């Protein structure tokens, strides 16, 4: 296989990678794709970290030049690549963030702690935004628990389509709240590890509405699959 995969999380720390590749000559779009598991420690594979705004490099570009995968490492059948990738992406966008919600709660608790210390909590606007963040996090958890309970009602299935849009925008807004609570400390390097954590959270949260499907893609999914609206015109790949 030859080609490139971009924005691969933690590829520089991984032994294996999954790849969606074209397996049928002349096929276009979502047709003719295969879902492969490939070892990274082989000739023909190069990994290049992508520097992020916060200074880290969690994402990577992976280049393949004649790399190989075993036939036993095909997931599903040749031609099913798109279907398998969408099922995996649906999990990433949805209930896989249940564990992430614990980190969200820690970040919110940290914001409240600092707001009480530096007086930001005296602002009615800050208190309102904290309350909004708290209720939003609870709503996320309850929806995720409903999905986990195997509730197959049409209402729950439609609401599940909103989950990625909901949590990613919520977390981005939490980063903005954190910076407003920190006030001037948001703009400088601090010895307080709490400030550094919130600064890093603010920077990384900017990507939440992009990876796993942008806001625009999520709104299309909600409109077309959840509300039954006409599909947006699409070009051919």
Each language-model region and where it sits:
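Glycine-rich beta->alpha junctions and the first turn(s) of the following alpha-helix
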Residues: 45-141, 208
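Hydrophobic packing residues in well-ordered alpha-helices of helical domains and bundles
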Residues: 104, 130, 160-163, 198
């Amino acid at each position: 296989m030859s080609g490139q995969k971009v924005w691969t999380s933690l590829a520089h720390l991984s032994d294996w990678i999954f790849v969606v590749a074209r397996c049928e000559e002349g096929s276009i779009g979502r047709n003719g794709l295969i879902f492969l598991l490939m070892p990274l420690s082989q000739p023909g594979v190069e990994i290049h970290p992508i520097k992020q705004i916060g200074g880290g490099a969690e994402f990577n570009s992976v280049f393949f030049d004649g790399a190989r995968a075993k036939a036993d490492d095909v997931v599903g059948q040749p031609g099913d690549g798109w279907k398998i990738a969408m099922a995996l992406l649906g999990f990433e966008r949805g209930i896989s963030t249940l564990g992430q919600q614990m980190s969200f709660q820690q970040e919110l608790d940290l914001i409240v702690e600092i707001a009480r210390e530096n007086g930001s909590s005296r602002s009615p606007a800050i208190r309102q935004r904290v309350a909004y963040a708290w209720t939003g996090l609870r709503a996320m958890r309850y929806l995720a628990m409903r999905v986990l309970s195997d509730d197959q009602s049409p209402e729950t299935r439609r609401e599940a389509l909103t989950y990625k849009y909901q949590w990613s925008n919520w977390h981005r807004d939490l980063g903005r709240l954190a910076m407003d609570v920190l006030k001037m400390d948001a703009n400088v390097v601090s010895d307080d590890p709490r400030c550094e954590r919130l600064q890093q959270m603010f920077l990384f949260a900017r990507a939440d509405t992009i990876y796993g499907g942008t806001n625009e893609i999520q709104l299309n999914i909600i409109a077309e699959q959840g509300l039954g609206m006409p599909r947006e015109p699409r070009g051919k790949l």
